Amino acid sequence: MPLIEQMWRISAVSISTRYVLIASMDVTPEAESLFNEVYDTEHVPNLLQVPGVHSVTRMKGEPARFAIAGAVRELPAPSPIYTAIYEIDHPQVLESPEWAEAVERGRWPSEVRPHTSNRQHLLFKVR
């Protein structure tokens, strides 16, 4: 099987929705532990209850070395450093009353959000 076909099969199986929201941000070092605790135990579970949200995958960037164009190059850690990928049915999920309520629930808005910066939100349609 050609590599491109293999990649398509992996992609088609890995993402189960037609849209993904990518939310990225930095967090102050003193709030990083609280950020991770609240994101994992409150924020993600709250958003997974929103109709049209199917999964959330969290990640933290790291520096790396990689070979390209005949040389090994340094890849710095990304900025922002934290990213979450939300698989959603359609863009209207993001403006629904359920989404609006979920993002303001728990400790996230009052105890965590003030410690975040460099926030980026990107919406992609899966092809």
Locate each region found by the language model.
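Macromolecular interaction modules
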Residues: 2-127
